[in-house]
């Protein structure tokens, strides 16, 4: 199991007041934003899924610049599958599904539809909103557990976007937590690696790994893509206030799509020395999930993670404008909101329309909220992802 907790940008008002006497500034040749350092705090701990608390060990750390979210985009397949459609192939009905999950529809890739194309469309829309040219992108992070190439899809996305400067592009595999990990990774690359414009994409097509005769899982998942542009900025404008990330491999048995047991050519190696060589082509099993255990895990760990991140940022639930969770189950979303005392009108949810879209769910919901005018520049959002691995994590961010 592992845990990580993150930088606190000086944009947090309470932290800025607490650290103001300690500010130090140094300058050299080059742009001022590259050489201005603010003294901020970070804290970390290593704990398990059943034991978390706010870290009280704080040590000063220098952060040269911040990062902010300046554009979003999303894309969905054209085929919509309703609960009534599913009732034609498994023993279920609309009321049974909607009461237990909050889901009524989901979108599914079919035929020659490509997840890479879907992700590229979402990324293109995010660039348009941010008014950033593709040639100015210097990193592409593709958060997915369902790449269309074993070795990853991110380079193909940068190609599809027409990025001519060969930006660093790679995949992040962390299931439904992937987008939150992607945001934190982008921030770390910007703060410590000199990157300026990072595309963070969450995209998954879990419908390809669903047993469509299993009503316990086929009702849950849909396909989609969402993206944001994370841009470097002065430390004072930093839009990632704090984060809190975890994993616990002991819970992997509750939610997995494991590789099938290798099949081998038993006719080889009559002397027994190479009996199981060469193996045949491997493939993955359908998604297997213990729904009750996943529900317990999410309701226990997600509020703890958000509370921890808020504490590191010097904030509490009343300071956030929006709660944006991975869209897995409406009961989970409501339970976490109740624990954090966040009213329903401050919850972002589009689960009913799209189902669980894994790494795409957070950026998809965020993009819709931004384009509808609900999320405005300056709004503070507590976001959290959780899923297979088990992995979970939260980030306190500011839009714009």
Swiss-Prot record:
One of its GO terms (cellular component) is chloroplast. One of its GO terms (biological process) is fatty acid biosynthetic process. It catalyses: malonyl-[ACP] + acetyl-CoA + H(+) = 3-oxobutanoyl-[ACP] + CO2 + CoA. The active site is at 176, 326, 356. It is an enzyme of class 2 (transferase). Its EC number is 2.3.1.180. It is found in: Plastid, Chloroplast. GO terms for molecular function: 3-oxoacyl-[acyl-carrier-protein] synthase activity; beta-ketoacyl-acyl-carrier-protein synthase III activity. The keyword Transferase applies. The keyword Lipid biosynthesis applies. Keywords: Chloroplast, Fatty acid biosynthesis, Fatty acid metabolism, Lipid biosynthesis, Lipid metabolism, Plastid, Transferase, Transit peptide. Its main location: plastid. Pathway: Lipid metabolism; fatty acid biosynthesis. Pfam families: ACP_syn_III, ACP_syn_III_C. Catalyzes the condensation reaction of fatty acid synthesis by the addition to an acyl acceptor of two carbons from malonyl-ACP. KAS III catalyzes the first condensation reaction which initiates fatty acid synthesis and may therefore play a role in governing the total rate of fatty acid production. Possesses both acetoacetyl-ACP synthase and acetyl transacylase activities. HAMAP family: FabH. Belongs to the thiolase-like superfamily. FabH family. NCBIfam families: fabH (TIGR00747), PRK09352.1 (NF006829). This is Beta-ketoacyl-[acyl-carrier-protein] synthase III A, chloroplastic. The lineage of its organism: Eukaryota, Viridiplantae, Streptophyta, Embryophyta, Tracheophyta. The gene is KAS3A.
